Amino acid sequence: MVTLDSILSAPSLSNLFLRFCQEIIFVCWPRNLDFGILASSFCLKMAEEESQEFKLKVNSELRFEVEHKASAEIEMIEGSGEMFGTELAKNKKYAFVSGSKVAIYTWHGCVLKLKGKTEVAYVSTETPMTVYVNTHAALEQMRSKAEEDSTRGPRILVVGPTDVGKSTLCRLLTNYAVRLGRSPVLADIDVGQGNMGLPGTIGALVVERTADIEEGFLNTAPLVFHYGHKSPNDNFQLYNMLVLRLAEIINVRCEQSKKVNSSGVIINTAGWIRGAGYEALKQAAGAFEVDVICVLDQERLYNQLKGDLPDFVKIVLLPKSGGVVERSQAIRADSRDSRIREYFYGLKNNLFPHTFDVKFNDVKIFKIGAPSLPESCLPLGMKSQDSQTKLVPLVPAMSLLHHVLSVSAATTVDHDIVETNVLGFLVVTNVDMDKSVFTVLSPSPRPLPQTILLVMDIQFMDIK
């Protein structure tokens, strides 16, 4: 019998990628707003610079980082190559914006032309791609077995500290699965990045097309839940509740489709792996009922999980790519701002958000989580942890200025608003207490699809 260990130690299995998926992305929930493409922050005009040509040998990759407030362009002239599992088209130019970190890998060799301002650009033959593709091959065998037996496919939790390439590995494994005709669920519970919505959210998407080279997965209608903070530690109780809720809905979706069920689930996690963060990882593993955990570049975490989780959960230690770059707190903050900006304005400033006033009386605004009180001050039978998931009504005030608001799909306050998905996001750009209105930046024109709004701790200054 072929095992995960034997696959991981086998030679490269790149010849597995023979079929391609060209189906329409499944819409997880009906969306009432056209929120556009979640792309990169903004597009800058290509600098007039001489292009560089790189000739890549077999099993090597070109790595480059785009300078701040600059842009770069890549074109494949000869051969074949891929970016995080998505194949590049020959003689097509791909644009990358400020701060982009790109790796183009080739199994058989290629020639690439790079134009623009980059902080660094070099070719490396030291990559973990063989290990990654063999991991995919092992997962694919599990999917094939699940398809034959009409059972559930593999559920993979990708864990590790910050800046080890967890999101990239999830994207790569998802793309490889899609290229073999699978339809995996990609879930993101890293609230610091918010790949499915905005920072401060978690979400999931059924993927049936490979990620776009420039824009990533086209999140036309992901399932997204409001969390409201940048770290799971800010409201541990709420975070675990939402992760469990997301897992429950994914289970329902898998029950509705044999293809999705056998394709499995790939889950990206936050880089918080100590203390309560480690407990959150274990709870996520239980909520999603994972059978494989990929630990990136953290032997301590690998051994902890081996000791604490059941034997049926296969835990593998994978190396990180040498191209992974550590980010400072300032860079992380810039990345969050860019993520919000791209939501409203698009990759190439090709989206045009709307600005309009909202009357105080037309909406109901809430914050999830009340200040903690001593047990002695709480009502009989209530625990202090319960306050973390309590819905607190807010009176509109100047303190709303620049805060991100989630538009809840709940139609009335009688709904379980905390565990209801959101339809989209707004930013408060002005508050007029005299007129009892506040101004919002919105992806679509008025009226709002629903009137229940949830406040985030996350703020955004709309300065272009």
Q: PLM features: what roles do these ranges have?
A:
Residues 252-313:
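Phosphate/Mg2+-binding loops and adjacent switch elements
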Residues 124-150, 164, 183, 204-205, ...:
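ASCE P-loop NTPase motor cores of helicases and related translocases
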Residues 22, 30-31:
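Compositionally biased, intrinsically disordered low-complexity segments enriched in Pro/Arg/Gln/His
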Residues 42-151, 158, 172, 231, ...:
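Preference for solvent-exposed, low-hydrophobicity sequence contexts
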Residues 155-175:
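Glycine-rich phosphate-binding P-loop
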Residues 185-264:
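Nucleotide-state-sensitive switch-loop elements of NTP-binding domains
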Residues 175-185:
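Post-Walker A helix-loop "phosphate-sensing" segment adjacent to the P-loop in P-loop NTPases
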Residues 153-157, 183-185, 264-266:
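Residue-level preference for the first positions of well-ordered beta-strands
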